[in-house]
Swiss-Prot record:
InterPro entries per the UniProt record, alphabetical: NHR-like_dom_sf, Nucl_hrmn_rcpt_lig-bd, Nuclear_hormone_rcpt_NR1, Nuclear_hrmn_rcpt, Znf_hrmn_rcpt, Znf_NHR/GATA
Compartments reported by the entry: Nucleus
Zinc fingers, NR C4-type class: 32-52, 69-93
Compositional bias (Polar residues): 546-558
Organism, scientific name: Metapenaeus ensis (Greasyback shrimp)
One annotated GO biological process: negative regulation of transcription by RNA polymerase II
Protein name: Nuclear hormone receptor E75
A GO cellular component entry from the record: nucleus
Keywords, in A-Z order: DNA-binding, Metal-binding, Nucleus, Receptor, Transcription, Transcription regulation, Zinc, Zinc-finger
Domain NR LBD residue range list: 138-392
Gene3D superfamilies from the UniProt entry: Erythroid Transcription Factor GATA-1, subunit A (3.30.50.10), Retinoid X Receptor (1.10.565.10)
Residue segments, region Disordered: 382-413, 454-519, 546-576
Amino acid sequence: MFCDQDMYEIPADCQVLVDKTVIEFDGTTVLCRVCGDKASGFHYGVHSCEGCKGFFRRSIQQKIQYRPCTKNQQCSILRINRNRCQYCRLKKCIAVGMSRDAVRFGRVPKREKAKILAAMQSVNAKSQERAVLAELEDDTRVTAAIIRAHMDTCDFTRDKVAPMLQQARTHPSYTQCPPYLACPLNPRPVPLHGQQELVQDFSEALLPAIRGVVEFAKRLPGFQQLPQEDQVTLLKAGVFEVLLVRLAGMFDARTNAMLCLNGQLVRREALHTSVNARFLMDSMFDFAERVNSLALNDAELALFCAVVVLAPDRPGLRNAELVERVHRRLVNCLQAVVSKHHPENPNLQRDLLSKIPDLRTLNTLHSEKLLKYKMTEHTAAGAPWDDSRSSWSMEQESSVGSPSSSYTTDEAMRSPVSCSESICSGESASSGESLCGSEVSGYTELRPPFPLARRRHDHSEGASSGDEATESPLKCPFSKRKSDSPDDSGIESGTDRSDKLSSPSVCSSPRSSIDEKERGGPARTICRCCARLQRRPSSTRICSWRKPTTSPIKSSVRNVGKRSLTPHSPPPPRSWSRRCLSLHSTRALWLRHTPPWPPVWRRPLA
């Protein structure tokens, strides 16, 4: 028989186990009350996973009586070992409140979910706070851990920098800098040499220093117990500030230079030219001079760096109160160390903490300079595109504003259209029919008007002189395609609404008209509805079914009057020739299923 629920006693470590498993999550996931796995929902009165839900359901439905536990019924039910002891697992299910009478149908209310998440976040925050405060109980141990982390992760401590700086001062060759111009007139890049090579080497050597700052922050007492989002926020905001505090000993106010890691000095003027940030470098030199005037040792610098990293006023912190408590404890440790080493200067800690706003200002300047540098790189990468667009717009204005203006041969070669394309007369260019003018609104958006090009006539063409040139505008290839291509259906596309408004006829297409001089006959248009070539004037609303006799596009429409399944435009039914006007009113219905420029004329549904 199934054992009754009263025979199971509630273990005392139930709530402790729940608190322990909650710590492993970020406070936004509901956990199983039995094994600590991710809960799938509210089952049998408690939040449980699918495994524990199915286990409890099978146990109560089949009335299974499990073998008693051989370990004094004290098995720890976790996700990794929940299947080892079924007796203790069922006991745990009943202990946390699972019952067949507590089955609820429907979804869990949002208000209840919010309460559960709030409770879990509260438990998580309290657990983290207890863990952090446990590491910060002993000030002596905290101070020793911070100093050890600083000495292990910093390659330019005071003990290491002092002999290097003394050696650099005694060798004047290190401080010699070749002459250079502040504003050179030659825009070509100057090759790196001397001081500029030192700056580049110093920049490359900063990568290990940045990794050292990150490692130093991870080894701070209480930092690993903070939420991961807060750790990332503190590192992003404090890496440059800690690096600047550490590099303060590398700035030499006596020689007005900065010591590189290879033992050489870089003058401030060389830094101005190399990094192109005069104000930022001057501010960094001034800050380093003020910090060096305090004569701090490595222990005091280590504690000051820890205070800078764990700043509670960083934007985006989730648990700012906990960071505030850690910050206050570190400030107390700094006060104890400063008072021990500088008893004659009681205001040293206040002067040291007053440098934090200066660090924030330098950090902001550095971020702005870095953003500007990235934008400059992006602009330099896209400079050819911008130049081409500007030259293209100039050619467009010249072609539209003055069609008769002349271009040189080099300018014509730079044009997007080669001079070997077909040439149309200046009269057609001025009228705007051969160019992609305002009438063809769809082409105007795709490509601007083509400029005029200078074409030279060879001696074989009968030119009077080899230097003689004839100015003629380049013919737009789209006009040739619209009149000569058999793929054109004459149907209005989505970009030709302006054509419809400006057209004098409902059935005529101005974008498919052919110049009379170019064709050698009367002007003809293609019907937009049935793709027929008209011989009547463009104002006629009824299509003409007579086959054209003289037309350059005769080969394109040679199958218009035939019933054949060719890749050319198939003819519509004959009744459509009398329904052109009615089709115009319903064209919007079937134009939605027709691409703007169909490769083959598609017959609409009757």
